[in-house]
Regions:
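Pre-NBD coupling/linker segments of ABC/ABC-like ATPases
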Residues: 40-52
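Flexible, glycine-biased helix-capping/connector loops in cytosolic signal-transduction modules
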Residues: 37-40, 196
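Cytosolic ends of transmembrane helices, especially the final helix of ABC transmembrane type-1 domains
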Residues: 6-34
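ABC-type nucleotide-binding domain
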Residues: 51-246
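Conserved E/DxxT/N motif and adjacent residues on the DHp alpha2 helix
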Residues: 33, 40, 154
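Membrane-water interface of transmembrane alpha-helices in multipass transporters/channels
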Residues: 1-2
Length: 246
Protein backbone atom coordinates (compact mmCIF):
# COMPACT_ATOMS: atom_id res chain seq x y z
CA UNK A 1 0.00 0.00 0.00
CA UNK A 2 2.85 2.32 0.87
CA UNK A 3 4.54 1.63 -2.47
CA UNK A 4 1.32 2.36 -4.35
CA UNK A 5 0.87 5.65 -2.47
CA UNK A 6 4.45 6.78 -3.17
CA UNK A 7 4.18 5.77 -6.83
CA UNK A 8 0.91 7.64 -7.27
CA UNK A 9 2.37 10.75 -5.66
CA UNK A 10 5.46 10.60 -7.88
CA UNK A 11 3.38 10.15 -11.02
CA UNK A 12 1.22 13.07 -9.94
CA UNK A 13 4.25 15.33 -9.58
CA UNK A 14 5.74 14.14 -12.87
CA UNK A 15 2.52 14.63 -14.82
CA UNK A 16 2.61 18.34 -14.03
CA UNK A 17 5.76 18.61 -16.14
CA UNK A 18 4.45 16.52 -19.03
CA UNK A 19 3.34 19.55 -21.13
CA UNK A 20 6.79 21.10 -20.72
CA UNK A 21 8.40 17.81 -21.70
CA UNK A 22 6.33 17.70 -24.89
CA UNK A 23 7.24 21.31 -25.71
CA UNK A 24 10.95 20.53 -25.21
CA UNK A 25 10.70 17.43 -27.40
CA UNK A 26 9.01 19.42 -30.17
CA UNK A 27 11.53 22.28 -29.93
CA UNK A 28 14.44 19.82 -29.91
CA UNK A 29 13.14 18.21 -33.08
CA UNK A 30 13.03 21.58 -34.85
CA UNK A 31 16.58 22.41 -33.74
CA UNK A 32 18.06 19.08 -34.82
CA UNK A 33 16.29 19.26 -38.18
CA UNK A 34 17.73 22.74 -38.69
CA UNK A 35 21.24 21.51 -37.81
CA UNK A 36 20.95 18.77 -40.44
CA UNK A 37 20.21 21.27 -43.19
CA UNK A 38 23.06 22.44 -45.39
CA UNK A 39 23.37 26.12 -46.17
CA UNK A 40 23.14 27.04 -49.84
CA UNK A 41 25.98 29.50 -49.23
CA UNK A 42 28.62 27.67 -47.18
CA UNK A 43 30.94 30.13 -45.45
CA UNK A 44 33.39 27.30 -44.68
CA UNK A 45 33.57 26.06 -48.26
CA UNK A 46 37.01 25.85 -49.89
CA UNK A 47 35.52 26.53 -53.31
CA UNK A 48 35.58 29.86 -55.11
CA UNK A 49 38.19 32.41 -56.13
CA UNK A 50 40.26 34.14 -53.45
CA UNK A 51 40.75 37.55 -55.02
CA UNK A 52 42.24 40.57 -53.28
CA UNK A 53 39.54 43.20 -53.66
CA UNK A 54 39.97 46.91 -54.25
CA UNK A 55 36.47 47.78 -53.05
CA UNK A 56 34.39 48.37 -56.19
CA UNK A 57 30.75 47.26 -55.91
CA UNK A 58 28.40 46.97 -58.88
CA UNK A 59 24.75 45.91 -59.04
CA UNK A 60 23.54 44.99 -62.53
CA UNK A 61 19.76 44.77 -62.96
CA UNK A 62 19.42 42.95 -59.64
CA UNK A 63 16.06 41.40 -58.82
CA UNK A 64 15.53 39.83 -55.44
CA UNK A 65 12.82 38.43 -53.19
CA UNK A 66 13.27 36.69 -49.85
CA UNK A 67 12.86 32.89 -49.82
CA UNK A 68 10.08 33.18 -47.24
CA UNK A 69 8.10 35.57 -49.51
CA UNK A 70 9.08 34.72 -53.10
CA UNK A 71 6.03 36.46 -54.54
CA UNK A 72 7.05 39.84 -53.07
CA UNK A 73 9.94 41.32 -55.06
CA UNK A 74 12.05 43.70 -52.96
CA UNK A 75 14.54 44.79 -55.62
CA UNK A 76 13.25 45.25 -59.16
CA UNK A 77 16.15 45.72 -61.55
CA UNK A 78 18.45 47.72 -59.26
CA UNK A 79 21.68 48.97 -60.87
CA UNK A 80 24.47 51.13 -59.42
CA UNK A 81 28.26 51.30 -59.15
CA UNK A 82 30.38 52.38 -56.20
CA UNK A 83 34.06 52.87 -57.01
CA UNK A 84 36.88 52.19 -54.50
CA UNK A 85 37.05 55.02 -51.98
CA UNK A 86 33.62 56.40 -52.87
CA UNK A 87 30.76 56.84 -50.43
CA UNK A 88 27.34 55.75 -51.64
CA UNK A 89 24.21 56.45 -49.59
CA UNK A 90 20.95 54.58 -50.12
CA UNK A 91 17.98 56.67 -49.04
CA UNK A 92 14.36 55.59 -48.95
CA UNK A 93 11.39 54.66 -46.79
CA UNK A 94 11.42 51.70 -44.43
CA UNK A 95 11.13 48.40 -46.28
CA UNK A 96 12.37 49.69 -49.65
CA UNK A 97 15.39 47.34 -49.65
CA UNK A 98 18.31 49.29 -48.16
CA UNK A 99 19.26 46.52 -45.71
CA UNK A 100 18.63 43.97 -48.45
CA UNK A 101 21.38 45.56 -50.54
CA UNK A 102 23.76 45.22 -47.58
CA UNK A 103 22.82 41.54 -47.19
CA UNK A 104 23.47 40.87 -50.88
CA UNK A 105 26.92 42.50 -50.76
CA UNK A 106 27.75 40.23 -47.81
CA UNK A 107 26.19 37.38 -49.83
CA UNK A 108 23.82 36.26 -47.12
CA UNK A 109 21.52 35.56 -50.08
CA UNK A 110 21.93 35.06 -53.82
CA UNK A 111 20.09 37.28 -56.27
CA UNK A 112 17.04 36.08 -58.18
CA UNK A 113 18.27 37.71 -61.39
CA UNK A 114 21.08 40.05 -62.40
CA UNK A 115 24.57 40.25 -60.89
CA UNK A 116 26.36 41.58 -57.83
CA UNK A 117 29.99 42.27 -58.72
CA UNK A 118 32.88 42.90 -56.33
CA UNK A 119 35.47 44.55 -58.53
CA UNK A 120 34.79 42.69 -61.81
CA UNK A 121 34.01 39.35 -60.16
CA UNK A 122 30.52 37.92 -59.80
CA UNK A 123 30.15 37.49 -56.05
CA UNK A 124 28.90 33.92 -56.60
CA UNK A 125 32.31 32.94 -58.01
CA UNK A 126 34.24 34.18 -54.97
CA UNK A 127 35.04 32.16 -51.87
CA UNK A 128 32.47 33.41 -49.31
CA UNK A 129 34.82 33.43 -46.32
CA UNK A 130 37.62 35.18 -48.21
CA UNK A 131 35.29 37.81 -49.68
CA UNK A 132 33.63 38.53 -46.33
CA UNK A 133 37.03 38.91 -44.65
CA UNK A 134 37.51 42.06 -46.76
CA UNK A 135 34.12 43.52 -45.84
CA UNK A 136 33.07 45.10 -42.55
CA UNK A 137 29.52 45.88 -41.50
CA UNK A 138 27.99 47.96 -38.72
CA UNK A 139 24.30 47.36 -38.19
CA UNK A 140 21.68 49.52 -36.53
CA UNK A 141 21.66 47.23 -33.48
CA UNK A 142 25.32 46.68 -32.48
CA UNK A 143 26.24 43.35 -30.94
CA UNK A 144 28.75 43.41 -28.08
CA UNK A 145 29.99 40.47 -26.04
CA UNK A 146 30.55 40.05 -22.30
CA UNK A 147 34.26 40.76 -22.44
CA UNK A 148 36.56 43.78 -22.41
CA UNK A 149 36.24 46.76 -24.75
CA UNK A 150 39.58 45.82 -26.30
CA UNK A 151 38.40 42.25 -26.96
CA UNK A 152 35.14 43.52 -28.45
CA UNK A 153 37.00 45.75 -30.92
CA UNK A 154 39.38 42.93 -31.91
CA UNK A 155 36.63 40.27 -31.99
CA UNK A 156 36.52 38.03 -35.06
CA UNK A 157 39.98 38.70 -36.45
CA UNK A 158 42.27 35.74 -37.08
CA UNK A 159 45.29 37.74 -35.93
CA UNK A 160 44.72 40.03 -32.98
CA UNK A 161 45.61 43.66 -33.78
CA UNK A 162 48.07 45.51 -31.60
CA UNK A 163 46.86 47.78 -28.81
CA UNK A 164 48.01 50.76 -30.88
CA UNK A 165 45.83 49.63 -33.80
CA UNK A 166 42.86 49.13 -31.49
CA UNK A 167 43.25 52.61 -30.02
CA UNK A 168 43.68 54.15 -33.48
CA UNK A 169 40.39 52.59 -34.58
CA UNK A 170 38.70 53.84 -31.40
CA UNK A 171 39.96 57.36 -32.10
CA UNK A 172 38.50 57.26 -35.61
CA UNK A 173 35.18 56.11 -34.10
CA UNK A 174 35.30 58.98 -31.56
CA UNK A 175 35.19 56.65 -28.54
CA UNK A 176 38.84 56.72 -27.38
CA UNK A 177 38.43 59.64 -24.95
CA UNK A 178 35.53 57.92 -23.19
CA UNK A 179 37.42 54.62 -22.93
CA UNK A 180 40.57 56.30 -21.62
CA UNK A 181 38.61 57.71 -18.67
CA UNK A 182 37.35 54.29 -17.57
CA UNK A 183 39.12 52.45 -14.71
CA UNK A 184 41.17 49.32 -15.38
CA UNK A 185 39.24 46.51 -13.66
CA UNK A 186 41.70 43.66 -14.21
CA UNK A 187 42.57 41.68 -11.12
CA UNK A 188 45.99 40.77 -12.49
CA UNK A 189 48.25 43.05 -14.48
CA UNK A 190 51.58 42.21 -16.03
CA UNK A 191 54.48 44.62 -15.71
CA UNK A 192 54.39 45.59 -19.40
CA UNK A 193 50.71 46.52 -19.40
CA UNK A 194 49.71 50.01 -18.42
CA UNK A 195 46.41 50.79 -16.75
CA UNK A 196 43.81 51.28 -19.44
CA UNK A 197 40.04 51.51 -19.68
CA UNK A 198 40.21 49.22 -22.70
CA UNK A 199 40.17 46.31 -20.25
CA UNK A 200 36.80 47.35 -18.80
CA UNK A 201 34.10 44.71 -19.31
CA UNK A 202 30.99 45.94 -21.10
CA UNK A 203 28.55 43.44 -19.58
CA UNK A 204 26.19 41.05 -21.31
CA UNK A 205 25.22 42.56 -24.68
CA UNK A 206 26.97 45.77 -23.64
CA UNK A 207 24.52 46.57 -20.85
CA UNK A 208 27.09 48.76 -19.08
CA UNK A 209 27.19 51.19 -22.01
CA UNK A 210 24.75 53.57 -23.65
CA UNK A 211 23.39 52.98 -27.13
CA UNK A 212 25.74 55.54 -28.66
CA UNK A 213 28.78 54.11 -26.89
CA UNK A 214 27.96 50.60 -28.09
CA UNK A 215 27.52 51.90 -31.61
CA UNK A 216 30.91 53.63 -31.62
CA UNK A 217 32.65 50.49 -30.32
CA UNK A 218 31.00 48.53 -33.14
CA UNK A 219 32.27 51.13 -35.62
CA UNK A 220 35.78 50.81 -34.15
CA UNK A 221 35.52 47.01 -34.57
CA UNK A 222 34.78 47.54 -38.26
CA UNK A 223 37.55 50.11 -38.78
CA UNK A 224 40.31 48.07 -37.10
CA UNK A 225 39.95 45.55 -39.93
CA UNK A 226 40.90 48.14 -42.56
CA UNK A 227 38.17 46.70 -44.82
CA UNK A 228 38.05 47.26 -48.56
CA UNK A 229 34.28 47.67 -48.28
CA UNK A 230 32.60 49.26 -45.24
CA UNK A 231 28.84 48.79 -44.91
CA UNK A 232 26.89 51.03 -42.52
CA UNK A 233 23.27 49.96 -42.06
CA UNK A 234 21.86 53.01 -40.24
CA UNK A 235 24.95 52.77 -38.04
CA UNK A 236 24.75 56.39 -36.86
CA UNK A 237 21.15 56.19 -35.66
CA UNK A 238 22.17 56.13 -31.97
CA UNK A 239 24.96 58.72 -32.22
CA UNK A 240 24.88 62.33 -31.13
CA UNK A 241 25.41 65.07 -33.73
CA UNK A 242 29.09 65.57 -32.88
CA UNK A 243 29.97 61.88 -33.17
CA UNK A 244 27.95 61.53 -36.37
CA UNK A 245 29.93 64.34 -38.01
CA UNK A 246 33.23 62.67 -37.03
Amino acid sequence: MYAITISSTTIGFASAYFPEYMKATFAGGIIFNMLKQRSKIDNLSSEGKREKLTGAVTFKNVRFSYPERPQIEILKGLSFTAKPGETLALVGPSGCGKSTVVSLIERFYDVKAGQVLLDSHDIRTLNPYHARSQIAIVSQEPILFDCSISDNIAYGLEERPSQQEIEAAAQKANIHSFIAELPDVRHQKSADQALTGYNTFVGDKGTQLSGGQKQRIAIARALVRSPKILLLDEATSALDTESEKV
